[in-house]
């Protein structure tokens, strides 16, 4: 386990590419149940944060793709146990169509009554900062 309580077996937090001697790019996985949210968020991240690898995944493939891609941040409509234990950060965006979102960074939860793109980007930036110091 890392300082943040992240299962390092499942996370790339702090991982270096031994052959190349450099840090791997941070990965974000977007897997919201609403297709429009999934596509718009992924497109926005690719434009506004081009230094981050963004993967768009069908919700039913969340756990399998999480294990395969090892993203540091997951944006989803329902967090799973695997994501909760393995991701450095996650955003449960409007779970069950609620008006609020839940964010976890290093296991500390925060509820946001109104998640907007700026807030999502600030969570991504904080996750990246944590990724770089672990």
Residue positions per predicted region:
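Short, charged N-terminal beta->alpha structural module
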Residues: 20-60
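Hydrophobic beta-strand segments of well-ordered beta-sheets in folded domains
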Residues: 24-29, 70-75, 88-94, 109
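Acidic, metal-coordinating helix/loop segments flanking the phosphotransfer/catalytic sites
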Residues: 57-73
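Short N-terminal or domain-adjacent regulatory/targeting segments
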Residues: 1-21, 96, 115, 119
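Compact, well-ordered interaction domains used in eukaryotic information-processing assemblies
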Residues: 49, 68-82
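Ser/Thr/Gly-rich flexible loops in soluble cytosolic domains mediating phosphotransfer, phosphorylation
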Residues: 90-134
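Short, polar loop motifs at secondary-structure junctions
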Residues: 59-61, 76-81, 94-99
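Short loop/helix-cap segments at secondary-structure boundaries that form the rim of catalytic
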Residues: 66-68, 81-88, 100-105
């Amino acid at each position: 386990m890392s300082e943040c309580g992240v299962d390092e077996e499942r996370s790339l937090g702090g991982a270096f590419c031994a052959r190349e001697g450099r840090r791997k790019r941070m990965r974000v996985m977007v897997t919201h149940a609403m297709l429009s949210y999934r596509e718009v968020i992924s497109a926005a991240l690719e434009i506004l944060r081009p230094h981050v690898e963004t993967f768009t995944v069908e919700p039913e493939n969340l756990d399998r793709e999480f294990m395969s891609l090892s993203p540091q941040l997951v944006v989803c409509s329902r967090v799973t146990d695997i994501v909760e234990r393995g991701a450095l950060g996650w955003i449960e965006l409007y779970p069950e169509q609620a008006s609020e979102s839940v964010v976890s960074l290093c296991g500390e939860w925060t509820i946001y009554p109104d998640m907007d793109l700026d807030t999502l980007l600030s969570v991504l930036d904080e996750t990246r900062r944590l990724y770089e110091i672990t």
